[in-house]
């Protein structure tokens, strides 16, 4: 019986792939796992395992895709996104760049936990001038009222819209489109989890149409200097989380482990605790890049406020949260270790 179900799913996916209606855009669906590919024993329970359903099954569950695009599915990895790695990011980058001329757009199915990070990495590194859309789900594929099928349909619709490429890499979920730089996951369980806290969504999806209302002025994809096509690894950058009563053990551990850069998830306007400050000051003097960010979800970490960044050789992250500041610092360090040049990158991207 299991074999029969598998054959039916593959056949349905093949039918979707074989759609040949005149003028349909060619979309490659790159699957990485996540809740959208999750499976649970109960349709109403909360327990499930991420990354269990293949990309062929995901596509087969939405036969309506054949009406809007020619779909080519590809399984890149099969993981929960809490286990995302730099290696997977580099693999996705390579795959899209290599396949760019073959397709009109790309959809990446992905777990929501680190989706914003993958989106931002690709937003900074892709050389492809085609729409790239990430999508996931907050309920597993076996869940009652699963949001994955509708989200996948909307993501393909978004990738098929040529104007999407002008936005850089985007996330399309819950009928809205948000750009990779500004998006963040805001809720642990609700379907409407993705928001762009500082600047809001860039588009909406309604009645089979994607409408864009705004556009980020930040440079992205082919406009950036961060070409990682020949890299096999990225610089090591860690995050230090500041809180009341924090000690310097974590910061010192990153220094001792010879990390290339450290991002401080500071309080307020990226402020550093007195237990951490001297460690990071010394680290910056010894050539370790230090970026100040904030654990506060909105607002900017501004230069030379309570902390004289120029005096200590620190970089301020602007509106980037700590996890995205880490990514930009990783990429910046592939080009330079000069804190002033790194600051320019944070001001531009």
What are the roles of these predicted feature ranges?
Residues 22-97, 278:
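ATP/NTP phosphate-donor binding region
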Residues 30, 54, 60-62, 179-260, ...:
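Accessory alpha-helical/coil subdomains and C-terminal extensions
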Residues 269-349:
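C-terminal non-catalytic interaction/assembly regions of soluble proteins
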Residues 109-130, 272-281:
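Short Gly/Thr/Asp-enriched flexible loops that form oxyanion-binding sites at enzyme active sites
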Residues 43-52, 120-133, 148-154, 185-191, ...:
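A glycine- and small-aliphatic-rich helix-loop capping segment at beta-alpha/alpha-beta transitions
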Residues 134-206:
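Internal gly/pro-rich beta-alpha loop/helix module
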Residues 100-115, 257-269:
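Short acidic, glycine-rich surface-loop motifs adjacent to enzyme active sites
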Residues 1-21:
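Gram-negative bacterial Sec-dependent N-terminal signal peptides
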């Amino acid at each position: 019986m299991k074999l029969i179900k598998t054959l039916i799913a593959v056949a349905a996916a093949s039918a979707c792939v074989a759609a040949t209606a005149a003028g349909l855009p060619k979309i490659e669906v790159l699957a990485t796992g996540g809740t959208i590919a999750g499976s649970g024993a109960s349709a109403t329970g909360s327990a499930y395992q991420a990354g269990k359903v293949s990309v062929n099954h995901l596509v087969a569950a939405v036969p309506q895709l054949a009406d809007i695009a020619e779909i080519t599915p590809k399984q890149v990895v099969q993981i929960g996104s809490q286990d995302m790695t730099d290696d997977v990011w580099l693999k996705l980058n390579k795959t899209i760049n290599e396949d760019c001329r073959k397709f009109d757009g790309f959809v990446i199915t992905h777990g929501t936990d680190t989706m914003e990070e993958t989106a931002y990495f690709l937003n900074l590194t892709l050389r492809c001038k085609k729409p790239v859309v990430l999508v996931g789900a907050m309920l597993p594929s076996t869940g009652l009222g699963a949001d994955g099928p509708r989200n996948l349909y909307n993501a393909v619709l978004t990738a098929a819209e040529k104007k999407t490429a002008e936005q850089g890499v985007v996330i399309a979920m819950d009928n809205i489109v948000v750009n990779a730089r500004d998006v963040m996951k805001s809720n642990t369980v609700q379907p409407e989890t993705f928001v762009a806290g500082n600047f809001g969504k860039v588009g909406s999806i309604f009645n089979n149409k994607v409408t864009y209302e705004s556009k980020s002025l930040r440079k992205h994809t082919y406009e950036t200097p961060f070409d990682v096509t020949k890299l096999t690894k990225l610089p090591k950058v860690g995050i230090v989380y500041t809180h009341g009563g924090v000690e310097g053990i974590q910061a010192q551990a990153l220094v001792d482990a010879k990390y290339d850069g450290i991002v401080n998830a500071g309080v307020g306007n990226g402020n550093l605790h007195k237990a951490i400050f001297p460690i990071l000051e010394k680290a910056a003097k010894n050539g370790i890049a230090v970026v100040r960010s904030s654990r506060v979800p909105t607002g900017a970490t501004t230069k030379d406020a309570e902390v004289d960044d120029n005096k200590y050789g620190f970089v301020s992250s602007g509106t980037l949260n700590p996890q995205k500041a880490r990514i930009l610092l990783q990429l910046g360090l592939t080009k330079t270790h000069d804190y002033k040049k790194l600051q320019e990158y944070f001001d531009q991207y």
